[in-house]
Amino acid sequence: MAHINQNFLKLPGGYLFPEIGRRVRAFSAQNPPMPLIRLGIGDVTQPLAPAVVDAMVKASREMGVKETFRGYCEETCCAYDFLRFAIRDSYRERGVDIADDEIFVSDGAKSDCGSIGDIFSADNVVAVCDPVYPVYVDTNAMAGRAGDYDGEKWTNLVYLPCTAENGFFPELPRERVPDLIYICSPNNPTGAAATCDQLKTWVDYANAHGSVILFDSAYEAYISEEGIPHSIFEVEGAKTCAIEFRSFSKSAGFTGTRCAYTVIPKELVREGASLNALWSRRQGTKFNGVPYVVQRGAEAVFSPEGRAQTRAAVDYYRNNARVIQEGLTAAGLTVYGGVNAPYLWVRTPNNTPSWDFFDLLLKQACVVTTPGAGFGPSGEGYIRVTAFGDAEATWEAVRRITSVL
């Protein structure tokens, strides 16, 4: 008889977003005429930049000609040189020297954040910020690192509370020393962005204890304030303790196109093994690379035209964030984030439980948000609102929300 991975049976009933989808479908089935505005799941609404589309069209035509057809990508790290070089140069513009063979192109930061555990022992102690992007937790639970779920927390995880009192940035753990430390900045879901000094504290800690920081930088394109690092490798010492994940999804609208990249410096060594080499071995075995057409589209993001066009889309979402922040604040709600991130972390009124406030906004305002409790215990009493909607819909959502408070 085939035996299953028992860790899957420990997972709670449903991943956060499918549960939201279930409630939304149930409401829509009972109220078919009601037009919903979705400010929950962080999917973009603006189309791909013209420069990206043109590059993909050109690449598609190349695939239809024998002389320019591309099959499996046999170049380094399952990625074409043209894209890795463009990514490398973008780092160098910020004073970060990354070698092209330290860049691994993939089909999404979610995939890489979820799969990076393949190169680490199941015995590693994992630390996650609380609230936290659920993928970090669930993938480690699947791998057997999380222990058992007690209805609120996993018994083997180290939770790092991120609250209004500490500026939504975690303090160093006082008890167990984690081996793997997940940090997301700008943060999903709170919208907070870490300073160099804050990250340096964690870099020094990781280097002192031999830990590895798994740094999710998927939203760095939304940083608007000076002094906020776009990469953890802007922090001295990070190359010996950190892996960075980035994505084209929110910076260039690739949620339906799928392209991202992970940076693993060759200086990052644990137990005598290069993590760069281990990940290369893992990817070579389990991943055949992102399609040539998509990689050409991603390359175009770094062209002068592509940069200007994708920046315009980012600014569009930033303006949505401003509208949400100003509108909900004027209505008396406490709102965090939205300045360096496309997410706003909104305190529920009168200590209303997150799911109750989610249901109220769904049923009375026909607006879909994300309950903070779905991101962990410290998320209770908040909802996450995304700035990825259409501008007109965002204005209308704010009007609807304020009308039911």
Language model segments and positions:
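Conserved PLP-binding catalytic core of the aspartate aminotransferase-like
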Residues: 47, 317-318, 331-364
